[in-house]
């Protein structure tokens, strides 16, 4: 878990030292205009965001839902075991932010608006990542390196967030955009230490920096499709995930994926 040092993989976007910080969790909320005045009394645990959230002026009556992706917390905690603590901290921010919008007097258009829905389960960005026979790193992403066992691809920017999240003084994210899409090799999609374990979604074999790109949903879905079809080959041939690669079954997998509509760059 956490970020690797710059020296480990020679990644220029990595921190100078291994600091163990992660991307945080987010909770969304939605609002609705009722067409008539609505009062809002914040719960006792609501946070005064004007004192605790450096970017509190970014809150407004018009934006809700995924536009508030930056309402994020937990990157400096254990994002596996501390989810409940992270959830409550985000609730404090959300109910405090709505109190600011409704009752500060700065947003008269919010008079007829109500807090329609608040999430209960934080959306995870990063927790554990597993090690496969190959680890995707920054250079694979920005140089679009070729892999003969490519079965998936990504195209999102390397999108890294400060561990302090909504409480940080830094920009809510740093995004580095590559000049094209990149391949994800099959060797990133199975464990190197557990014989019968596939990896997909947010836990594929990648560095923290490369994960900043591979973590998004569409890319995760592409990897999951590749894993599902590889698993079918394993069952049919009675072989392990690694043996799909070592027994020369990658071309077969690539053809099956292509026929199902899975795009693989440069294949």
Enumerate the language-model features and the residues they cover.
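Flavin (FAD/FMN)-binding glycine-rich loop and adjacent Rossmann-like elements that form
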Residues: 1-267
């Amino acid at each position: 878990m956490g970020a690797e040092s710059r020296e480990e993989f020679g990644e220029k976007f990595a921190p100078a030292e291994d600091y163990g910080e992660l991307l945080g969790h987010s909770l969304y909320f939605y609002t609705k205009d009722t067409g008539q005045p609505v009062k809002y009394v914040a719960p006792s645990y609501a946070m005064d965001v004007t004192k605790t959230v450096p970017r509190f002026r970014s809150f407004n009556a018009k934006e809700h839902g995924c536009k508030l992706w930056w309402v994020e917390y937990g990157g400096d905690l254990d994002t596996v075991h501390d989810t409940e603590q992270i959830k409550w901290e985000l609730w404090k921010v959300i109910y405090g932010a709505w109190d600011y919008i409704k009752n500060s007097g700065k947003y008269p258009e919010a008079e007829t608006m109500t807090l329609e829905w608040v999430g209960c389960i934080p959306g995870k960005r990063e927790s554990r990542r597993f090690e496969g026979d190959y680890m995707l790193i920054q250079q694979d992403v920005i140089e679009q390196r070729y892999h003969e066992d490519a079965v998936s691809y990504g195209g999102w920017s390397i999108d890294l967030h400060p561990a302090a999240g909504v409480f940080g003084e830094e920009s809510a994210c740093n995004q580095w955009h590559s000049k094209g899409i990149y391949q994800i090799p099959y060797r990133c999609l199975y464990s190197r230490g557990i014989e019968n374990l596939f990896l997909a979604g947010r836990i594929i074999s990648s560095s923290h920096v490369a994960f900043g790109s591979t973590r998004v949903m569409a890319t995760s879905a592409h990897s999951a499709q590749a894993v599902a079809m590889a698993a079918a080959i394993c069952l049919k041939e009675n072989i392990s995930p690694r043996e799909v690669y070592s027994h020369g079954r990658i071309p077969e997998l690539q053809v099956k994926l292509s026929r199902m509509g899975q795009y693989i760059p440069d294949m």
